[in-house]
Every structure is written in structure tokens, then in C-alpha cells.
Amino acid sequence: DRQWSRGLGDVYKRQAHMKFTNVRVPKENLLLGEGRGFEIAQGRLGPGRIHHCMRAIGAGEVALELMCKRGIDPNKVAFGKNLAQLGANFDYIAESRIELNAARFLTLDAAVKMDTVGNKVAASEIAQIKVFAPNVALKIIDRAIQIHGGEGVSQLTPLASMYAHMRTLRLADGPDEVHRRAVARYELGKYMS
């Protein structure tokens, strides 16, 4: 039984929802053993989350580039100044670079920890980046949309589509709240006997 659905951020792909009824799997075809499927899935989620975060950082870089180019475009001038010099745009550009670098370094740290001590030990770092990187990308994309004005939410730039994809990414592999909870439990666990 299969149903297709589309959602925000699924502009280029479709997702199938499959329901299995009365399915039997021979014992020799079981992986790890009966009831251990979630364990297998969890083992693959860490690398997938790193991948999501790298995509988020890439999207943030593209948005920052578009923001900067729009900010210095000689054809986009208001009050005798280019857009980068108006309002808080200088701050937005600086904050975007700082936040992108922080997301990149947190992601690299989590990847190194995964490689050296394994996914289970790196679970807190993975959860942290899964919250941080997509949220940073969303903020930067939103700033880029703002500096582009109405064009930023049109199909003339990739920004609106990028925003939809990054917003969806905050739900992929568990929403932010689940990952924040994991980080908090890890932190509290350090102080409990």
C-alpha cells in the first residue's frame, strides 16, 4: 500500500509512505535480530545528520554570497548608498559569516568525534549540530531575502526555495526539540550520580 505526498521543501522530490500488512521475514533475513531495526536505523542517522548539516552550511554560504553581491550591486542604490551600507546590513553580513564559521566548526568537531570514538559517544555533538546548522542557514537565508526585497521571495533567486528546504530540514531525522532534549539529557547526565 503506497501513497505519495509532497510538502514544503519537497520541490524536487516526492516521498512515499508505505504500509506493510501481514509481512513475514524469514529468520535468516533478519538484520541483527528481531526487534533491532531501530538500532540499525539509529546507527545510520549520525552520518546522515552530518550530511544534512553540511548541506545547511552550503546553503548558508550561497545565501551569504547572494546577500553580499546584492549589497554592493551598483544598480541597487537607496539614499545615495549601496544596500550593504543601509540599516543593519553590515551587521547581518558579519553575523552571517560568524555564525557560518561556528556551524562549520561544530560540524567538523562532530565528524571528527564520530570518526575517532563512534556515533554513540558523539551523540550530543551530532544533536547540537542538527539544531544549530539548519537554524543558522535559515537566519542567513532570511537576511538575504530581506536585502533582496520582493525579489528574494520570487523565483528570480533560489532564496525562497532554499528557505523552504532548510525549514524542512529542521524536521528531518527528528525536530529540533528532540535534539535539544538529547543535548540537555547528556548535560544533566554529567551531574547525576
Task: Identify what each model region corresponds to.
Residues 24-26:
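Active-site/binding-pocket entry motifs
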Residues 1-12:
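Single conserved hydrophobic/aromatic residue that forms the stacking wall/gate
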